[in-house]
UniProtKB/Swiss-Prot annotation:
There is a cross-link at residue 599 (Glycyl lysine isopeptide (Lys-Gly) (interchain with G-Cter in SUMO1)). Residues 81-218 are annotated as: Coil 1B. The gene is Lmna. Proteolytic cleavage of the C-terminal of 18 residues of prelamin-A/C results in the production of lamin-A/C. The prelamin-A/C maturation pathway includes farnesylation of CAAX motif by protein farnesyltransferase (FNTA and FNTB), removal of the last three amino acids (-AAX) by RCE1/FACE2 and/or ZMPSTE24, methylation of the C-terminal cysteine by ICMT and endoproteolytic removal of the last 15 C-terminal amino acids by ZMPSTE24. Proteolytic cleavage requires prior farnesylation and methylation, and absence of these blocks cleavage. Farnesylation of prelamin-A/C facilitates nuclear envelope targeting. This is Prelamin-A/C. Residues 1-27, 384-442, 552-577 are annotated as: Disordered. The record marks 325 as: Stutter. The record marks 266, 330 as: Heptad change of phase.
């Protein structure tokens, strides 16, 4: 086909060869040729425009169809993501409330721990003070015992001296008795001498009377004779008689005076000797009595001091016994508190270790999810580039956040793990349900499976021969313990059945050892039942373990942004067909009403299972999330079943709202 530009030189060449042209003609011809060229170009342009419009119409039709398909897919994904975001917001709210409550409980526990620690420190100070006081009292007791031993030795010495003094007193009393006897003898002799003196005086008077009578008789005879004698010789006889009488009287008086003097001298000498000996004896007796009195006074004072010391010693011993009893009680209390604190600390360490393990597992899951989200983001970006679609600002923002998060995860994985550990919390709690229909109740069940404790709460003895304790953990085989045929549980008594692995001693009727079983078993759902001899269940206790996990709101918001980014993306195969893209969905059972909440979007193809287990003190939600993407043969497609993860969320406090006020319904 010949173009107008190819035809124009031929025509102009022919005209130029036929006739000469004027400049005006030439100018017009050139303008004509220019117009023809422009017309040809316009025709070609119009043809091209028409063909392009036809192609554009076809493309618009295809674009419209593609946009309708994409809008349908995006609307479905958006609905699913909005439902998912609603559930996530509710979960975040509940998790935030639970975290606040757990923080309050943690602060209370820390305050209690500080208070108990302060009390323990105070008790230890009191114990040290009591020990110091005990040492002082022991030193005082030793000094008092030394003083008592000294007083006892002095008492023994004084008792020896008293014994010697008593011997001396006995000797002196014997000497005094002998002196008294001698004094009595001397007094008897004096009385005898006085009697003799009186007798001699009476004899002397009698002799005087006799002599006077004889003298009168002689006088009378002489007078009668004188009458007869001469008066001349009367005076001679009278003078001679007077002289003889005077001489006889003088002799008698001299003899009596001499005898009297001898008696008085002998009596006075003996009396002086007796008085001197009596004075000596009385002085000795007085000294002995005085020494005896002083000894008695000293013995009385020492006895009073000894009794006072004995009373003080008894009081000190009673006080020492009281202090020892109080010290023993304080030691027992301190040991019990320390044992409880050590047990609580061991439990807290075990729980912390368990939580750290769970945190590590959750971090690993989070890292895997971050890698999968990053891979999904790359796939979506590849599809957008292939379809030449401009990314939304949210996608760009999410892509920037994902790139920064990826760099942080690659460059500082330990920092991310540490931040995750600090921004999330997990707690394991146990809830117990007990029921009793008889006298005996299941009082305590060990979480580690070491023992089962029963108590007779009635005022009567209970025969438990051939009774059974049945223990089961979830779907595990049933464990049965049978009591001895003659076993009886006293009123108010407690019996503990130990597993053989607990290391307890068999001491009936308070401690029994199940030698056939090393442990009672441990797990998340322990049911212990007491069966009587007729096969009737009279008591039951169920122990349920719940795990509570709380994550920081910032991390959840980042996950929400990543989910929003996934909502706004789309996947297509290389041939233009939409790929099946199954993101997250969740099925949750209400802990109060028990009804499921179906929030999965239609056409998403996600299959997620969840359940809630609620007890008297804790509730938990197990959420399983599945991701599946089936792409075409494009370079950005993935295989099936990328990841399936299970999470355990929960609230340690029981739900108090009714089914009408259920947040899910």
């Amino acid at each position: 086909m010949e173009t107008p530009s190819q035809r124009r030189p031929t025509r102009s060449g022919a005209q130029a060869s036929s006739t000469p042209l004027s400049p005006t003609r030439i100018t017009r011809l050139q303008e004509k040729e220019d117009l023809q060229e422009l017309n040809d170009r316009l025709a070609v342009y119009i043809d091209r425009v028409r063909s392009l419009e036809t192609e554009n119409a076809g493309l618009r039709l295809r674009i419209t169809e593609s946009e309708e398909v994409v809008s349908r897919e995006v609307s479905g994904i958006k609905a699913a993501y909005e439902a998912e975001l609603g559930d996530a917001r509710k979960t975040l709210d509940s998790v935030a409330k639970e975290r606040a409550r757990l923080q309050l409980e943690l602060s209370k526990v820390r305050e209690e721990f500080k208070e108990l620690k302060a009390r323990n420190t105070k008790k230890e100070g009191d114990l040290l003070a009591a020990q110091a006081r005990l040492k002082d009292l022991e030193a005082l007791l030793n000094s008092k015992e030394a003083a008592l031993s000294t007083a006892l030795s002095e008492k023994r010495t004084l008792e020896g001296e008293l014994h010697d003094l008593r011997g001396q007193v006995a000797k002196l009393e014997a000497a005094l008795g002998e002196a008294k006897k001698q004094l009595q003898d001397e007094m008897l002799r004096r009385v005898d001498a006085e009697n003799r003196l009186q007798t001699l005086k009476e004899e002397l008077d009698f002799q005087k009377n006799i002599y006077s009578e004889e003298l009168r008789e002689t006088k009378r005879r002489h007078e009668t004779r004188l009458v007869e004698i001469d008066n001349g010789k009367q005076r001679e006889f009278e003078s001679r008689l007077a002289d003889a009488l005077q001489e006889l009287r003088a002799q008698h008086e001299d003899q009596v005076e001499q005898y009297k003097k001898e008696l008085e001298k002998t009596y006075s000498a003996k009396l002086d000797n007796a008085r001197q000996s009596a004075e000596r004896n009385s002085n000795l007796v007085g000294a002995a009595h005085e020494e005896l009195q002083q000894s008695r006074i000293r013995i009385d004072s020492l006895s009073a001091q000894l009794s006072q010391l004995q009373k003080q010693l008894a009081a000190k011993e009673a006080k020492l016994r009281d202090l020892e009893d109080s010290l023993a009680r304080e030691r027992d209390t301190s040991r019990r508190l320390l044992a409880e604190k050590e047990r609580e600390m061991a439990e807290m360490r075990a729980r912390m270790q368990q939580q750290l393990d769970e945190y590590q597992e959750l971090l690993d899951i989070k890292l895997a999810l971050d890698m999968e989200i990053h891979a999904y983001r790359k796939l979506l970006e590849g599809e957008e580039e292939r379809l030449r679609l401009s990314p939304s600002p949210t996608s760009q923002r999410s892509r920037g956040r994902a790139s920064s998060h990826s760099s942080q995860s690659q460059g500082g994985g330990s920092v991310t793990k540490k931040r995750k550990l600090e921004s999330s919390e997990s707690r394991s709690s146990f809830s117990q349900h007990a029921r009793t229909s008889g006298r005996v109740a299941v009082e305590e069940v060990d979480e580690e499976g070491k023992f089962v404790r029963l108590r007779n709460k009635s005022n009567e003895d209970q025969s438990m021969g051939n009774w059974q304790i049945k223990r089961q953990n979830g779907d595990d085989p049933l464990m049965t313990y049978r009591f001895p045929p003659k076993f009886t549980l006293k009123a108010g008594q407690v019996v503990t059945i130990w597993a053989s692995g607990a290391g307890a001693t068999h001491s009936p009727p308070t401690d029994l050892v199940w030698k056939a079983q090393n442990t009672w078993g441990c797990g998340t759902s322990l049911r212990t039942a007491l069966i009587n001899a007729t096969g009737e269940e009279v008591a039951m206790r169920k122990l349920v373990r719940s795990l509570t996990m709380v994550e920081d709101n910032d991390d959840e918001e980042e996950d929400g942004d990543e989910l929003l980014h996934h909502h706004r993306g789309s996947h297509c195969s290389s041939s233009g067909d939409p790929a099946e893209y199954n993101l997250r969905s969740r099925t949750v059972l209400c802990g109060t009403c028990g009804q499921p909440a179906d929030k999965a979007a239609s056409g998403s193809g996600a299959q997620v299972g969840g359940s809630i287990s609620s007890g008297s003190s804790a509730s938990s939600v197990t959420v399983t999330r599945s991701f599946r993407s089936v792409g075409g043969s494009g370079g950005g497609s993935f295989g099936d079943n990328l990841v399936t993860r299970s999470y355990l969320l929960g609230n340690s406090s029981p739900r108090t709202q009714s089914s009408q006020n259920c947040s899910i319904m």
